[in-house]
Amino acid sequence: MPEKVAVLLGGTSSERQISLQSGHAVVAGLREAGIDARPIDTKNFLVTELKEKGFTKAFIALHGRDGEDGHLQAVLEFLKIPYTGSGVMASALAMDKHRSKMIFQGAGLPVSPYVALNREQIWPNVTQNTSNDLLLNNRISNKLIKNINQLGLPLIVKPSREGSSFGMTKVEHLDQLDDALKKAWHYDEEILVEKWHFGTELTVAILGDTVLPSIRIQVSDIFYDYQAKYVSDKTQYFCPSGLKQEQEKQLATLSMNAYRALGCDGWGRVDVMLDDEGHFYLMEINTAPGMTDHSLFPMAARQAGFSFSELVCKILSLAH
């Protein structure tokens, strides 16, 4: 039976627009290679109908919740439809920055110092519309301030289960923390407050068992946020990254160890920070990286000799 591939895109997460761009690029790349690929927007399509519609494989181009977090992967496994990328557990863990950090720490891998906060546990009576100064009027906040003081300023506040830098804020003064937490809470009940590292942001693409050339990211703004990732033409990317050979080897080993620690499979991208003292810190793993014209995975693949069409065909060949 000829192969019929559903490229799952769009969805309902905050990363919907990025996913639409990624998915349509993937469809074009697969069709260029002669593969019967169809765009399927999961916002308007029941995934459980894929089998009866004759689809034999699924290329997951969804980003964020309900596409990258293990839910979709579980449905596809139930349907016995091979799909691209990591399995249920690895997808769920990678989507959850807090739990992935815990696993990295358990594996002896370096992560940035952080505090994990649950809104209901820390401030059970607070809503997003609360106008009180939380840091001054809530008795639990004293414990929070103590923990944060141990991290030191500046900080980065982010939702634990969100992508594309949605809900992230750099905090340079303690009085900015309240608004930063509320912004993050808009996206998730669990928030990470991390130590801010001055240094270089790097990303490492992994394709099958191969570590592709690393990319160094240079932003003109405060940090590598949504604007810098998908809109700005001022963000600069260097591939290869220009690291010393020994650092490049160290980065590749760290990235693969992190990838394996979560049980990732097929393809993925590992984000790493190199601080000014030469120390690497794992940030997160993306199990369904972006494939837009601003995306980093295709850039690393080009450096390794893959055309875009060859890349998406290789990813599809790794479906399980």
Swiss-Prot record:
Keyword terms, alphabetized: ATP-binding, Cell shape, Cell wall biogenesis/degradation, Cytoplasm, Ligase, Magnesium, Manganese, Metal-binding, Nucleotide-binding, Peptidoglycan synthesis
Alphabetical list of InterPro entries matching this protein: ATP-grasp (IPR011761), ATP_grasp_subdomain_1 (IPR013815), D-Ala_lig_Van_CS (IPR000291), D_ala_D_ala (IPR005905), Dala_Dala_lig_C (IPR011095), Dala_Dala_lig_N (IPR011127), PreATP-grasp_dom_sf (IPR016185)
Pathway(s) it belongs to: Cell wall biogenesis; peptidoglycan biosynthesis
Principal subcellular localization: cytoplasm
Residues in ATP-grasp domain copies: 101-317
GO BP: any one term: regulation of cell shape
HAMAP family per UniProt: Dala_Dala_lig
Protein name: D-alanine--D-alanine ligase
